[in-house]
Each structure stands twice: as structure tokens, then as C-alpha cells.
């Protein structure tokens, strides 16, 4: 992402933080854990990383299921909203994952963040490196779409118009992940009148 687009994206997320949780999309995504968590192995001895955590749509319910959650994002405004919720076993981390992580995690979870990252192969390598051996990967994002989901794609920091999950699976395999699979997991109803499917990509380090 060039500097102009990077700044535009940062401004978008800063402005969006106040209204994000009131949006229709956010309210719909609040139901995602009901579909996602039963597909994972979760217990109180685990420490999970929520990549692109935003205001905590996954981090907060996940914290009820595991021992510790690290909520990672590059948006200070989004993370401030999450910090205000004062969930004791959520650690807030404003950090660029490409700079590396010191902690090793039991699992990495992410929802609707991948399409904002330009270098997906490198991201997958970083996620693999931060997982313990056998650690779980659970990534949720849009199937390939025509650009209508976000509309102002450049202004909203969109790097990919969704994904072909088979291609993403192959990239994850190249990054070192094993036992990979994907499935349709959720649909989002957009204000434009269209429905957009989401997939879940799962694997193990």
C-alpha cells in the first residue's frame, strides 16, 4: 500500500471506530462466534491471537472460552474501544505483525482482516511462526467479490476483493500449515441489497 492509501486507510478506521459497533455489519458479525467457536478446540489453558481484532467482535467472546487473548490491530482508535470494555484476560497490542511477535500462541483467529493486507503469503508465514507446534489457524473472510462490498475500496484500505479460498489454502500450505480445509461459514446482508458469503479457512501449524 502506498503512503497516500495507507494514510487514507488509517483515517477511515479512526473515523469508523465510533460508529463501527452500531453498524448492521458489526451486529451481524456478532453472531459469527456462534458458528465459528464450535469448530475450534478451545480451553482455559490456551492463549489465542486475534489478528485484526478491531473493537473485539471475536476477542470478547473468545475470552470467555480460553485463558488469554491478545487482540492485535494497527488501529489505535479501534483498540481503544476494545480497551474500554475492560475484559481482564484480553491484552491489547497495537503492532504491525510483519515486525514479528515475541509470544507463541495456541491459536490464531481472524475475521474480515485479511482483505486489508497486501502481502498474504508473508502474513501467513508470520502467523505460522507465531503459533506453537500444532497450534490452530482460523481465518474468516469474504469469498471473491466484485468490489461492491466496500464501495470505496482504496479509501477503506482494501487490498483484495475477497479471496478464492482454494488459492488461499495453497498459500497457507506453502507457509507451513497442515490439515488445511475451508468451508462456507456465514452470510452478510449488505445495505446494497446483496448477500455476501464468508468462508472459514482452518489448519494447524
Please give the residue ranges for each predicted region.
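A short glycine-rich, Lys/Arg-flanked "PGG" loop and its adjoining helix->strand segment in the class I
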Residues: 122-133
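Short glycine-centered segments of the SAM/dcSAM-binding site in methyltransferase folds
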Residues: 47, 134-136
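C-terminal lobe and adjacent flexible extensions of AdoMet/dcAdoMet transferase-like proteins
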Residues: 201-205
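Short catalytic micro-motifs in class I SAM-dependent methyltransferases
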Residues: 112-113
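Conserved class I S-adenosyl-L-methionine
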Residues: 1-41, 58, 78-81
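Class I SAM-dependent methyltransferase SAM/SAH-binding core
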Residues: 49-99
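C-terminal alpha-helical "lid/dimerization" subdomain adjacent to the S-adenosyl-L-methionine
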Residues: 3-5, 21-27, 58, 138-195, ...
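A conserved beta-strand element that flanks and buttresses the S-adenosyl-L-methionine
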Residues: 109
